[in-house]
């Protein structure tokens, strides 16, 4: 098992100019991370306007990680394979393929892409709609799976984006692709977005997990936070609403309302031998929150 972090943790520092991606890599190494995960936030591995691969950025990031001795574990990309217009859907698949090219250029063996990131308002996020749109998701995944396979990259799908956050939905999606080599990026916190118990969901999903996203949330009643409700406002430090009408906000690991101790006990007892990647998205300064969260993750792991 390897502990590490997602560069996503330090996105605010990159957006505000306090850190470069190379500083983020140094930070991860200095804080004992065995691996680092990248997301394309403030990191234009693929130009968002032209959709062209930024080969020089990919190469320099890969070389920096090699020079400091830290592994790049995965690359995670939001995507919506359920666009109603066929042409738009085709363009979205081609956009994801460019990110797969970036993953290959970074030297990666695995990559996560979404199928329906934040595109289903709560009133349409139903069981009926899930099964109605399942064939479209599978069609897109199969095309992208062929593309990743040619580059010897393992596809992982995550309980992310609200439409497939529940354990039953994400497992059904993975199983329905027909590919045994499609694995899961298991996010221990994202089950909360659909009001599912994280401990029970983690137990169910662990056999499929290739990589685990470790995070914590504060969980509150909606009535206790008047005026704070906003669908999908998952920015760091923001309250956002769950499917069942509760409110969530990212916290420092171990300081929120998730039972992180029991979650990590379950993971450790399972013999999981993959990657655990911290995702800090609280309102504290990101450098401080990430540092404390990494220390908490190790301290809890050693004690469970």
Where are these regions (language model features)?
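Catalytic domains of carbohydrate-active enzymes, especially glycoside hydrolases
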Residues: 20-41, 107
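Conserved, mostly hydrophobic/aromatic
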Residues: 5, 28, 36, 65, ...
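Boundary/entry segment of secreted carbohydrate-active catalytic domains
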Residues: 1-17
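Active-site beta-loop-alpha junctions enriched in small/polar residues
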Residues: 8-12, 39-41, 77-80, 116-118, ...
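C-terminal helical cap(s) of enzyme catalytic domains, especially alpha/beta-barrels
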Residues: 287-304
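Active-site acidic/histidine proton-transfer and metal-coordination neighborhood
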Residues: 23-26, 58-71, 82-184, 193
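Glycine-rich, proline-tolerant flexible connector loops at the mouths of alpha/beta enzymes
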Residues: 37-61, 115-121
């Amino acid at each position: 098992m390897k502990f590490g972090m997602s560069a996503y943790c330090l996105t605010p520092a990159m957006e505000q100019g306090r850190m470069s991606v190379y500083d983020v890599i140094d930070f991860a190494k200095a804080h004992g991370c065995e691996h680092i995960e990248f997301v394309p936030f403030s990191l234009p591995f693929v130009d968002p306007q032209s959709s062209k691969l930024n080969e020089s950025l990919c190469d320099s990031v890969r070389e920096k990680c090699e020079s400091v001795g830290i592994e790049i574990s995965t690359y995670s990309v939001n995507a919506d394979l359920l666009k109603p217009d066929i042409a738009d859907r085709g363009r979205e698949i081609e956009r994801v393929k460019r990110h797969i090219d970036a993953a290959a250029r970074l030297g990666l063996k695995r990559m996560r892409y979404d199928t329906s990131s934040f595109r289903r308002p709560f009133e349409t996020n139903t069981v009926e709609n899930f099964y109605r749109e399942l064939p479209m998701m599978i069609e897109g995944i199969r095309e992208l799976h062929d593309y990743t396979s040619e580059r010897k990259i393992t596809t992982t799908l995550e309980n992310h984006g609200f439409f497939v956050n529940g354990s039953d939905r994400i497992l059904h999606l993975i199983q329905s692709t027909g590919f045994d080599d499609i694995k899961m990026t298991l996010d221990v916190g994202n089950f909360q977005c659909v009001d599912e118990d994280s401990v029970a969901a983690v137990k169910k999903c662990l056999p499929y997990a290739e990589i685990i996203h470790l995070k914590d949330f504060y969980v509150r009643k909606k009535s206790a936070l008047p005026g704070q409700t906003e669908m999908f406002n998952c920015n760091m430090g923001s309250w956002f609403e769950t499917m069942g009408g509760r409110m969530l906000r990212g916290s420092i690991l171990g300081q929120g309302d998730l039972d992180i101790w029991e979650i990590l006990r379950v993971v450790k007892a399972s013999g999981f031998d993959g990657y655990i990647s911290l995702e800090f998205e609280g309102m504290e300064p990101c450098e401080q929150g990430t540092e404390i969260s990494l220390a908490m993750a190790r301290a809890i792991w050693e004690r469970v």
